[in-house]
C-alpha cells in the first residue's frame, strides 16, 4: 500500500478508530485512579451485586475498572473496540476476561453492564448512540442493572476549558482545544514536537438526564436514580456528572 493510500484510509476512519492508540495511552496513562476507586465503590454500595454476578465493563479501555472489580472478587469481563488497549490490559492483567468488540453489538448476557467515564455518545447520530442502549437492554438478564457514567451538558457548557497544553517530554507537547458544536463537544488534539507530530479528534454527543432516561425506558431499562459525582452526591441540574442507573424489568 502506498503512503497516499494509507493516508486516504486513515482519513476515512471514524475518530474513535484512530484515537485510542499508543498516543492515547501516553496522554492518559496515569488518569486519576482515585476517581476509578470511588466509582467502583459507589457501584458496589449501590447495586450490591453477588460475587457470582456476571459484570461487563463496556468500553473497558486499558482495564482500570475491570482490574479493581477483579481484585474485589467479582466476575468481570471487558469489551473495547481498540485492539491495542485490550492487548495492553491483557498483558498487565492476564487473569482478566477482555475481548475486542463494538458496543452496539454486545455478545452474551450479563447481570450488570457498566458504561464508565463518558464511554457513550461517540457516534454522530442519535440513532447510532441509541443502538448502544438497545444492545445493553438486549444483553441484560431480567433484573439486571445498567450503570451509565456520563457528562452533564449544562455543567460542561459553564465550565468548558477552551485549551490546555501538556508537556509529555522535553520534545513532545500536546495541545487540546475544545468547543461545543451542535450538541457535540469536540476536542482537537495535536501532538507537536521534535519526536511527535500527530493530529486526532474526539467527539462526544451531549445528552441530558431526561434524554438518557427516555432511551433507558424505550429499551426496557427502568431508570432508578442518578448521582452527580463519584462521591455519590445526589444529582442536581448543575452536577458535574450524570451517573444514571436503571434495572431491566
Regions found by a protein language model. Name each.
Residues 112-127:
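A short SAM/SAH-binding and catalytic strip from SAM-dependent methyltransferases
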Residues 48-50, 107, 124, 141:
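Short conserved AdoMet
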Residues 104-113:
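A short acidic, Gly/Pro-enriched loop at the edge of an enzyme's catalytic core
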Residues 147-215:
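SAM-dependent methyltransferase
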Residues 2-50:
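Conserved class I S-adenosyl-L-methionine
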Residues 56, 63-105:
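Class I SAM-dependent methyltransferase SAM/SAH-binding core
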Residues 130-142:
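A short glycine-rich, Lys/Arg-flanked "PGG" loop and its adjoining helix->strand segment in the class I
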Residues 211-249:
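C-terminal lobe and adjacent flexible extensions of AdoMet/dcAdoMet transferase-like proteins
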